[in-house]
Amino acid sequence: MKQYLDLLQHVMENGSDRGDRTGTGTRSVFGYQMRFDLAQGFPVLTTKKLHLRSIIHELLWFLKGDTNIAYLKENGVSIWDEWADENGDLGPVYGAQWRSWPKPGGGHIDQIANLVESIKTNPNSRRHIVSAWNPAEVDEMALPPCHCLFQFYVADGKLSCQLYQRSADIFLGVPFNIASYALLTMMVAQVTGLKAGDFIHTLGDAHLYANHFEQARLQLTRQPKPLPVMRINPDVKDVFGFAFEDFSLENYSADPVIKAPIAV
């Protein structure tokens, strides 16, 4: 995807070298935006192969409201292993905030259920928002949410999504985030009777770790291929009713994986 390669090149050429929490060092810019028309294909990288299984299972895990890595491990997904405690728990991370945001007087708010209902009943609303950033619980999370707030927008029979990501690990994290939220947009569009529009990805601190520079340079030598098509089982009408088998990526051709270390 040219949009992603443009981001890589922009940060490599214009970013500021800074320290960071992990001690690895980064090159970063503050404030960057990419836009993907989902009618033009599914926005998954073709200049390095991505593990789509991990992306789909992680999204389904979020939608379950789950915060223990047991489901992920059962399905061969290890992307959260470094942050889990000895029992596999992560604290009140994404799934908890999406599905059971605690109310001050007791009880919980299911933001995803409310979102879907709001899109169906009041599509022109400017309040189609889900937040994972809960200041009261951030300190209890194994990792505070990087992709922390998203908003949906309905126009001309199409559903678009804008994500704000406060912290963006460009080489390892951002490709997963693009595909994940593009897929979420398609799923929500299907269950609300709409077509998928655009996915807009807004980044706050967009950074390349110093030990990813060589990998980024290699990726920039590769040419993007045509985007694949994501097929979703049309019979699923409940956003919580999707299973892994309901998704099929067709015509995905990608360059080999480029390995890079995770900064924890």
From Swiss-Prot:
<dbReference type="GO" id="GO:0004799">
    <property type="term" value="F:thymidylate synthase activity"/>
</dbReference>
<comment type="subunit">
    <text>Homodimer.</text>
</comment>
<keyword id="KW-0808">Transferase</keyword>
<dbReference type="InterPro" id="IPR020940">
    <property type="entry name" value="Thymidylate_synthase_AS"/>
</dbReference>
<dbReference type="InterPro" id="IPR023451">
    <property type="entry name" value="Thymidate_synth/dCMP_Mease_dom"/>
</dbReference>
<keyword id="KW-0545">Nucleotide biosynthesis</keyword>
<feature type="active site" description="Nucleophile">
    <location>
        <position position="146"/>
    </location>
</feature>
<dbReference type="InterPro" id="IPR045097">
    <property type="entry name" value="Thymidate_synth/dCMP_Mease"/>
</dbReference>
<feature type="binding site" description="in other chain">
    <location>
        <begin position="207"/>
        <end position="209"/>
    </location>
    <ligand>
        <name>dUMP</name>
    </ligand>
</feature>
<dbReference type="InterPro" id="IPR000398">
    <property type="entry name" value="Thymidylate_synthase"/>
</dbReference>
<feature type="binding site">
    <location>
        <position position="169"/>
    </location>
    <ligand>
        <name>(6R)-5,10-methylene-5,6,7,8-tetrahydrofolate</name>
    </ligand>
</feature>
<dbReference type="GO" id="GO:0005829">
    <property type="term" value="C:cytosol"/>
</dbReference>
<protein>
    <recommendedName>
        <fullName>Thymidylate synthase</fullName>
        <ecNumber>2.1.1.45</ecNumber>
    </recommendedName>
</protein>
<feature type="binding site">
    <location>
        <position position="51"/>
    </location>
    <ligand>
        <name>(6R)-5,10-methylene-5,6,7,8-tetrahydrofolate</name>
    </ligand>
</feature>
<dbReference type="GO" id="GO:0006231">
    <property type="term" value="P:dTMP biosynthetic process"/>
</dbReference>
<feature type="binding site">
    <location>
        <position position="263"/>
    </location>
    <ligand>
        <name>(6R)-5,10-methylene-5,6,7,8-tetrahydrofolate</name>
    </ligand>
</feature>
<keyword id="KW-0963">Cytoplasm</keyword>
<dbReference type="Pfam" id="PF00303">
    <property type="entry name" value="Thymidylat_synt"/>
</dbReference>
<feature type="binding site" description="in other chain">
    <location>
        <position position="177"/>
    </location>
    <ligand>
        <name>dUMP</name>
    </ligand>
</feature>
<keyword id="KW-0489">Methyltransferase</keyword>
<feature type="binding site" description="in other chain">
    <location>
        <position position="21"/>
    </location>
    <ligand>
        <name>dUMP</name>
    </ligand>
</feature>
<feature type="binding site">
    <location>
        <begin position="126"/>
        <end position="127"/>
    </location>
    <ligand>
        <name>dUMP</name>
    </ligand>
</feature>
<comment type="pathway">
    <text>Pyrimidine metabolism; dTTP biosynthesis.</text>
</comment>
<dbReference type="GO" id="GO:0006235">
    <property type="term" value="P:dTTP biosynthetic process"/>
</dbReference>
<dbReference type="GO" id="GO:0032259">
    <property type="term" value="P:methylation"/>
</dbReference>
<comment type="function">
    <text>Catalyzes the reductive methylation of 2'-deoxyuridine-5'-monophosphate (dUMP) to 2'-deoxythymidine-5'-monophosphate (dTMP) while utilizing 5,10-methylenetetrahydrofolate (mTHF) as the methyl donor and reductant in the reaction, yielding dihydrofolate (DHF) as a by-product. This enzymatic reaction provides an intracellular de novo source of dTMP, an essential precursor for DNA biosynthesis.</text>
</comment>
<dbReference type="InterPro" id="IPR036926">
    <property type="entry name" value="Thymidate_synth/dCMP_Mease_sf"/>
</dbReference>
<comment type="similarity">
    <text>Belongs to the thymidylate synthase family. Bacterial-type ThyA subfamily.</text>
</comment>
<feature type="binding site" description="in other chain">
    <location>
        <begin position="166"/>
        <end position="169"/>
    </location>
    <ligand>
        <name>dUMP</name>
    </ligand>
</feature>
